[in-house]
């Protein structure tokens, strides 16, 4: 992209933008929640649409001059409904957290009981963490993974639901590498008279391409971000049954947000169009293949994988047997150009600021063009770095740079 105007107006910010571009180009990005947008998405984000205020919804705005942005938002809504086979869509949420908040405010009262996945077992802050608004406003009861299999035990979820009678069951995760059984969760919700909300922020791209079962037929609400496996701008979306459309829209605007970000909604529309193309399914298939190969390669070096593998785009690695914490592994690998994040593991014994594990994802590197052979090399580099953490890391930095040079970012 051309940053001539930025360079003239603000050299410091222009320099930092360039610096970040170089960091991304010369690093292997394994953070599961990150991806690289297309130039088309980026151009939409930096378009004239950023100038327009448009409180309300298409044909029901509180400002004049909205006829063009109405078309933009309508396109985004229609495309995402087609992508997921949904009855209603709201594309205004600024983030996944705000998407979840809007659903909660649509059907819950303060203090209502909700069943959600424990953050330390793979859930998300907004699924009831006591430090988050969700855990502060509502009575969340957490479910986790089985101690032996490290996967969700649906009978345990059912028992908790029968005991606590939640008004809402929340499914979805930020660090869970296995298929989630939405049909069974719907049956549990029906048994106790609960609503079902599914947060597919991490797996949206897999769901859209049929590589993970869709929650849309089963859930009352489905929320997501647009910037992870969907490869779009940073933002959120909500899908729901038509009967919830009015109450949901009201709880986004004027409930928790004012004016929507029309340049971001345009970029969402572009990413939905891209996700409807056959090439996007090919991309997502490669994401999953890469995750499988990377997982197998890491296992061959003695790394302990939570649940012994992956069905999706991410891998949760328990480093307990490697004599290194998640925090130290993150810092070590960052120093050679591999970016990932420390992450709690089931039955965690360390602080969330230290952790016993790391989370690894393949969406971003797959966007760059990395395939199976590169996964084997990445696993080898990670193993060598941790094994030789107090040794000379320069050869490993060179191996990372060589991989990055083969696959330019743009």
UniProtKB/Swiss-Prot annotation:
Superkingdom: Bacteria
Signal sequence, renumbered to the chain: none
Pathway it works in: One-carbon metabolism; tetrahydrofolate interconversion; Amino-acid biosynthesis; glycine biosynthesis; glycine from L-serine: step 1/1
Transferase listed as a keyword: yes
InterPro entries to which the protein is assigned, alphabetical: PyrdxlP-dep_Trfase, PyrdxlP-dep_Trfase_major, PyrdxlP-dep_Trfase_small, Ser_HO-MeTrfase, Ser_HO-MeTrfase-like, Ser_HO-MeTrfase_PLP_BS, SHMT-like_dom
Annotated positions for site Plays an important role in substrate specificity: 227
Cofactor(s) this protein requires: pyridoxal 5'-phosphate
Principal subcellular localization: cytoplasm
EC number: 2.1.2.1
Subcellular location: Cytoplasm
GO BP term (any one): tetrahydrofolate interconversion
Catalytic activity: (6R)-5,10-methylene-5,6,7,8-tetrahydrofolate + glycine + H2O = (6S)-5,6,7,8-tetrahydrofolate + L-serine
UniProt modified residues of type N6-(pyridoxal phosphate)lysine: 228
Cellular compartments per GO CC: cytosol
Key words, A-Z: Amino-acid biosynthesis, Cytoplasm, One-carbon metabolism, Pyridoxal phosphate, Transferase
Oligomer and partners: Homodimer.
Function according to Swiss-Prot or TrEMBL: Catalyzes the reversible interconversion of serine and glycine with tetrahydrofolate (THF) serving as the one-carbon carrier. This reaction serves as the major source of one-carbon groups required for the biosynthesis of purines, thymidylate, methionine, and other important biomolecules. Also exhibits THF-independent aldolase activity toward beta-hydroxyamino acids, producing glycine and aldehydes, via a retro-aldol mechanism.
Family that this chain belongs to: Belongs to the SHMT family.
Protein name: Serine hydroxymethyltransferase
Source organism of this protein record: Clostridium perfringens (strain SM101 / Type A)
């Amino acid at each position: 992209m051309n940053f001539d105007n930025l360079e003239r107006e603000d050299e410091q910010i222009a320099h930092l933008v360039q610096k970040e571009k170089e960091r991304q180009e010369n690093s292997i990005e394994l953070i599961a929640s990150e991806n690289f947008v297309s130039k088309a998405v980026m151009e939409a984000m930096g378009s004239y649409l950023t100038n327009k205020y448009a409180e309300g919804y298409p044909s029901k705005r509180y400002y004049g001059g909205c006829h063009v942005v109405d078309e933009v938002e309508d396109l985004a809504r229609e495309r995402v409904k087609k992508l997921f086979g949904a009855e209603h869509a709201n594309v205004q949420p600024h983030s996944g957290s705000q998407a979840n908040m809007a659903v909660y405010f649509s059907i819950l009262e303060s203090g209502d009981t909700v069943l959600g996945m424990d953050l330390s077992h793979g859930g998300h802050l907004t699924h009831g963490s006591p430090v988050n608004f969700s855990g502060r406003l509502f009575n969340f009861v957490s479910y986790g993974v089985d101690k032996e299999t490290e996967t969700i035990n649906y009978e345990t979820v059912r028992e908790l639901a029968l005991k606590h009678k939640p008004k809402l069951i929340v499914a979805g995760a930020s660090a869970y590498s296995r298929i989630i059984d939405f049909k069974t969760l719907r049956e549990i919700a029906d048994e106790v008279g609960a609503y079902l909300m599914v947060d597919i922020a991490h797996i949206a791209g897999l769901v859209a391409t049929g590589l993970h079962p869709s929650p849309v037929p089963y859930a009352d609400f489905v929320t997501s971000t647009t910037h992870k496996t969907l490869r779009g701008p940073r933002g959120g979306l909500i899908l729901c049954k038509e009967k919830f459309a009015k109450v949901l829209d009201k709880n986004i605007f004027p409930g928790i947000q004012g004016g929507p970000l029309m340049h971001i909604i345009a970029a969402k529309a572009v990413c939905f169009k891209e996700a409807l193309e056959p090439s996007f399914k090919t991309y997502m298939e490669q994401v999953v293949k890469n995750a499988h190969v990377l997982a197998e390669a890491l296992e061959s070096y003695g790394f302990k994988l939570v649940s012994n593998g992956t069905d999706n785009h991410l891998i949760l690695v328990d480093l307990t047997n490697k004599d290194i914490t998640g925090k130290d592994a993150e810092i070590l690998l960052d120093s050679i150009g591999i970016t990932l994040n420390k992450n709690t593991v089931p039955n965690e014994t360390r602080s969330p600021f230290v952790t016993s594990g790391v989370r690894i994802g393949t969406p971003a590197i797959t966007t760059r063009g990395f395939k199976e052979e590169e996964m084997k090399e990445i696993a080898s580099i990670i193993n060598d770095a941790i094994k030789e953490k107090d040794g000379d890391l320069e050869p490993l930095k060179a191996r990372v740079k060589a991989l990055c040079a083969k696959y330019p970012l743009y």
